[in-house]
């Protein structure tokens, strides 16, 4: 009988696949969250993705290794709202590294919460050499090149700001009939991904944790109603021409912030953070509606009351669209390290989802 639990615990920790178990694949990760939204940074063990661009690398993953994406995002290693980033070689000579974003449905074009976590961990781990209290990190992502700044105190990154890609309004004051909901008014804006923006109060919704299931159900229905009726074409990159999610907007009970966001994206994922690409599209929308001016900072919070600050720092013309360059600020935290074993003999090796 085991008497010394401390010794037993050490032996548990020393478990390793046996030599004859060559069917094991080991993938390592750094576990983070930004405003409550998880980010699993895949650091090693994943096959090297091929392609000259990040979009090409994402396509290589989709075509050849999608089962590993499912294994890392789905239960039992993940859950229906899991999110990840696969670190890759940079696409451009002046970038530090690249990232392919993964989730429960597949792949995304931009992820602000991931950029914040990647920037913080890149500086604190020494992937990018610290240059004093402010360090620039340049990341290639599917929608383009992202410039981020890590602001440190006593060698600890306290917050991160990043400049998003040109963000613009794609369609204003649209409406669609949604089965079981009725007529829904919405705008579509792009902030690295296309979102439909909906006033929550117009549908009787409250942006609180107690309504998460209803928010997911409504977000899914609205997205599926919009997709067949509204064609979305990115002006320069066909692979970005899709509606990524629905963002519900409402006032916040916190008078110190501008408003609250809840983003339902991919296959019914609910973002715990305010959504970096989502607030980028929102600031473009507010600017187009003359509700804010350049360099006016607003703070947007999530369903958990975690917050991002965002402002439009510049106006640009992007492929015929009046666009702005958003600057988004937030913070992230490291909450663990992972070592994931994928055993070829396991009938559930590539995971499953019950929701």
From Swiss-Prot:
EC number(s) per entry: 4.2.1.77
Zinc-finger is among the record's keywords: no
What molecular functions are annotated in GO for this chain? 4-hydroxyproline epimerase activity; trans-L-3-hydroxyproline dehydratase activity
| This protein's record includes keyword Manganese | no
Binding, substrate: 112-113, 276-277
Catalysis: reaction(s): trans-3-hydroxy-L-proline = 1-pyrroline-2-carboxylate + H2O
Into which family does the record put it?
Belongs to the proline racemase family.
Query: Which PANTHER family does this UniProt record tie to the protein?
Result: TRANS-3-HYDROXY-L-PROLINE DEHYDRATASE
Task: Explain the purpose of this protein.
Answer: Catalyzes the dehydration of trans-3-hydroxy-L-proline (t3LHyp) to Delta(1)-pyrroline-2-carboxylate (Pyr2C). Together with LhpI, is involved in a metabolic pathway that converts t3LHyp to L-proline.
The name on file for this protein is Trans-3-hydroxy-L-proline dehydratase
Q: What is the lineage of its organism?
A: Bacteria, Pseudomonadati, Pseudomonadota, Gammaproteobacteria, Alteromonadales
